[in-house]
């Protein structure tokens, strides 16, 4: 119910949910699309991975097509990252740099601050112990 409420209020919805080896889950139903404001956009990054290779996180998504249904534009591009490779690389590099600033102090020494929520959540091993699987 909360997702439906948020979708109805949104101008843009970007869905990315995929489960390896299974069809993409339906997160945005046709009824939810009908509730959206005219001119809204859904970018379905799970396009072509729905049941029987049709749809994505929204069953109205058409693989490798941009279509308008119920006044809402649905983008079903299956290779969107390749279209923005330079931007995606720059964004990734910036995120890595920002993370490194959290774990390397001004003297260039590795410093793991477990009080920092981001650092703590990213710590996989410590002192020979696996912290997360």
Where are these regions (language model features)?
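Adenosine-phosphate binding glycine-rich loop
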Residues: 47, 52-133
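ADP-ribose/adenylate-binding Rossmann-like module
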Residues: 12-75
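Short, structured secondary-structure boundary patches
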Residues: 1, 35-38, 97
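Glycine-rich phosphate/diphosphate-binding loop of Rossmann-like nucleotide-binding domains
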Residues: 1-8
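Short, flexible, glycine/charge-rich loop motifs used to bind or transfer phosphoryl groups or to couple energy/partner
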Residues: 3, 31-32, 112
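A generic short-segment signal for beta-strand/edge and adjacent turn/coil regions
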Residues: 10-13, 41, 88-94
